[in-house]
Amino acid sequence: MGYSVIVIDDDEDTVRLFSEFLEENKIHVIGQGYNGKMAVELYQKNRPDCVLIDIMMPNGSGFYAINKIKEINPHAKIIAVTGDGRFTTEQKLEKLQIPVIYKPFKMNEVIQKIQS
């Protein structure tokens, strides 16, 4: 069986395109959300193998969601997908041990991170 993921980004086009690409590559998208609060709700409901999440979003940032998801499951696999390359963001992600993919990204890089 393939991997299951939820895709979280405040840009609906990004979520749609990302999801289509993942499905084409046999990665099952079991949830889509547009803010940190939705990410937590989708994780609780679906328990995916992996969460792909943007960092800068309204109604609960990616960091909010990461912390809440880690409270639910400390071993949850989360990958940050962000255009925010500030050093402070990098430090926070490193401290949380969250791998990051910077926008613009290559989809092959995303597939590799999900499967690793």
Residue ranges and their predicted role:
Residues D9, D54:
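Active-site residues of response regulator receiver
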Residues N35-M38, N59-Y64:
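Acidic catalytic/metal-coordinating carboxylates
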Residues E41, F63-P74:
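Short amphipathic alpha-helix used as the core "switch/output" element in two-component signaling
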Residues Y43, I55-M57:
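Residue immediately C-terminal to the conserved phosphorylatable aspartate in receiver
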Residues E12-G31:
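Two-component/phosphorelay signaling modules centered on CheY-like receiver
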Residues F105-I114:
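C-terminal output helix
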Residues N46-L52:
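Active-site beta3 strand of CheY-like receiver
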